Curated annotation (Swiss-Prot):
One of its GO terms (biological process) is response to insulin. The gene is CELA2A. GO terms for molecular function: endopeptidase activity; serine-type endopeptidase activity. Residues 17-28 form a propeptide. This is Chymotrypsin-like elastase family member 2A. Residues 1-16 form the signal peptide. GO terms for cellular component: extracellular region; extracellular space. It is found in: Secreted. Its EC number is 3.4.21.71.
């Protein structure tokens, strides 16, 4: 029964998640752009303590009131973390935003930092306290288990990652339109080849828009037919040649491959 309840709250069946009070403004701007404030209300900034300051390192998605979904490669056992929710500007303490300590991190047991191409780049962060849901802080939905998006499906990556290779980190949350690249194409030798696995999603590769350093762990947001946004991907890796590289789309952990793992972690922790 507990497991069934967890699945019912996490998976995109109920409209209690994935429907922002302030819907995102989806323009046709090429490249990234400032997101409408609070239009991705499950987006979090994962920050670590360093020399008395808190520094943004990765993104994440609030999927339960005390659980955040992020990438395994974002987590180091030697660091102390917190998450910031309900925020548009990282430098401003905004009304309605909250900062919560991370009490526990659970990294996928098959994740190997020396074998990024094997996938399983997924982690869950348990928060020290539950986050109250408001018009600025809402839960992200998970897609149904096994869901595979078709080629050219429109999604949006969000985060505070660099605007370009070796570029500046933005203060304002960014959004970028990415088209899904199906596995048959992305695994072609002239694209990512065997580096890409079926537990991943490719999106982008147009040489213009991509995720970049600082976006890691954040969501690939894709809208379902019922207008509900679902977190289909977790920003995992890009090309060593740089961000926005042609035929080297951003690679995401495919969330729909890990529904059972997510439910099990939450149930047992």
């Amino acid at each position: 029964m507990i497991r069934a309840l967890l699945l019912s709250t996490l998976v995109a069946g109920a409209l209690s998640c994935g429907v922002p009070t302030y819907p995102p403004q989806l323009s046709r701007v090429v490249g990234g752009e400032d997101a409408r404030p609070n239009s991705w209300p499950w987006q979090v900034s994962l920050q670590y303590s360093s020399s008395g300051q808190w520094r943004h390192t990765c993104g994440g998605s609030l999927i339960e009131q005390n659980w955040v979904l992020t990438a395994a490669h974002c987590i180091s056992s030697s660091r102390t973390y917190r998450v910031v929710v309900g925020r548009q500007s990282l430098s401003t303490v905004e009304s309605g935003s909250l900062t919560i300590a991370v009490s526990k991190s659970v990294i996928h047991e098959k994740w190997n930092s020396n074998q990024l191409a094997q996938g399983n780049d997924i982690a869950l962060l348990k928060l020290a306290s539950s986050v109250p849901l408001t018009d600025k802080i809402q839960l992200g939905c998970l897609p149904a288990a096994g869901t595979i998006l078709p080629n050219n499906y429109v999604c949006y990556v969000t985060g505070w990652g660099r605007l370009q290779s070796n570029g500046a980190l933005p203060d304002i949350l960014q959004q970028g339109k990415l088209l899904v690249v199906d596995y048959a194409t992305c695994s072609n030798p002239s694209w990512w080849g065997s580096t890409v696995k079926t537990n991943m999603i490719c999106a982008g590769g147009d040489g213009v828009t991509s995720s970049c350093n600082g976006d890691s762990g954040g969501p690939l947001n894709c809208q379902a037919a019922n207008r509900q946004w679902q977190v289909h991907g977790i920003v995992s890796f890009g090309s060593s040649l740089g961000c926005n590289y042609y035929r080297k789309p951003s690679v995401f952990t495919r969330v729909s491959n890990y529904n059972d793992w997510i439910s099990s972690v939450i149930e047992n922790n």
